[in-house]
Design a protein with these regions (language model features):
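Alpha-helical transmembrane segments within multi-pass membrane transporters and channels
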Residues: 100-145, 291-294
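Membrane-interfacial amphipathic/re-entrant helices at transmembrane-helix boundaries
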Residues: 1-62, 101-109
């Protein structure tokens, strides 16, 4: 009876992501003194835990879009990191008026933000068209922007890092004056809530799962599978554009070589750790959120243990192997 109860608990969708996050946090508690200690400095919350929550914000946003892509198309969008770089470059180029560095906006801030989001969504639409209309494999289709994205960013910025040294630009990646909670975390929460409402209050969530499970059968019952897949990629592009804005705001610049670097792998891993099948179909936004925090907690832990940035991907790869093994049918039978 006891073994059956444990097996039922372990079979729950959120068991694996919660277990992984708890395991990483346990390691932090053992290795890092005062890990859960939180204090306020200059009106802003500080601490290891706050740093993880803050730094995971872009990944949480990306994971929302990636979850829909994986569920609808049984594929992944490996261009999200490059899309972040392009969106950041577009925003900063508009705000600087083409100059390398400014201390005052050349154009309205809202114009730069809207342009970045539109560009992100446009890249997502391009990917969605290739996958849904031309039936190109998702990884191959998104490989185009993965390869060309940073080159496009370099063209936009003339191969230089563009700086926007204006205090208001840093609010999106920092915090509002007098408000202790990091702005990126607030934005991430809003994206998660809005995505959840969109999928639960409309039939979109059901359609995405249906298309992911069986595209042909969905078409036969009247679901526009092509449009659903297209929409998933467009939304993923929009999320990437927003994440790019936050990343750019953190460093008040557009760095084509570093913004969004390796974020595509982290986003895919967050979705996988979240208990979502990479084969499409049913999905869990909550699982993806937990997966994103787990990845960021793991990254922060490795850096705290003085693991070099070159070696961090190796440890993440080990995690991928373990997660894939745990989700395999063979392990489930065992």
């Amino acid at each position: 009876m006891k073994n059956k109860t444990l097996k039922n608990i372990a079979s729950q969708r959120l068991f694996l992501p919660i277990f992984c996050l708890a395991l990483v946090l346990l390691v932090n508690i053992i290795t890092t003194p005062n890990f859960f200690s939180i204090e306020i400095r200059d009106g802003v919350l500080y601490g290891y835990l706050i740093d993880i929550i803050n730094r995971a914000s872009e990944l949480v946003i990306l994971a929302m879009g990636m979850t829909l892509v994986v569920s609808a198309s049984a594929g992944t969008d490996i261009s999200v990191g490059a899309t972040m770089a392009v969106s950041a470059a577009v925003c900063c180029n508009i705000l600087t008026g083409g100059e390398r560095a400014v201390t005052a906006y050349a154009n309205p801030l809202i114009l730069g933000f809207i342009a970045a989001l539109v560009v992100g969504a446009a890249i997502g639409c391009f990917n969605g068209f290739l996958v849904s209309r031309l039936n190109i494999q998702p990884m191959v289709a998104t490989l185009i922007m993965y390869t060309a994205g940073r080159g496009i960013s370099q063209l936009i910025t003339d191969g230089q890092i563009t700086y926007v040294r204006v205090d208001s630009y840093r609010i999106l990646g920092g915090s509002f004056p007098g408000f202790p909670v990091p702005t990126p975390f607030i934005v991430a929460v809003l994206v998660v809530v809005l995505t959840s409402l969109l999928l639960k209050k409309t039939a979109l969530g059901m359609y995405i799962q249906s298309v992911g499970i069986n595209k042909r059968a969905s078409q036969l019952v009247g679901i526009k599978s092509v449009f659903i897949i297209f929409l998933a990629y467009a939304y993923c592009g929009l999320c990437s554009g927003l994440a790019g804005l936050i990343a750019s705001s953190r460093i008040y610049s557009a760095d084509a070589n570093n913004i969004g670097l390796n974020m595509e792998m982290d986003a895919i891993l967050a979705v996988a750790i979240g208990g979502n099948s990479l084969g499409g179909g049913k999905f869990s936004l909550a699982g993806s959120v937990i997966g994103a925090f787990t990845i960021q907690a793991l990254t922060t832990t490795l850096y705290a243990m003085h693991v070099s940035s070159d070696q961090v991907p190796v440890y993440k790869a080990i995690v991928v192997v373990i997660i894939v093994a745990l989700q395999s049918p063979g392990f489930a039978r065992w």
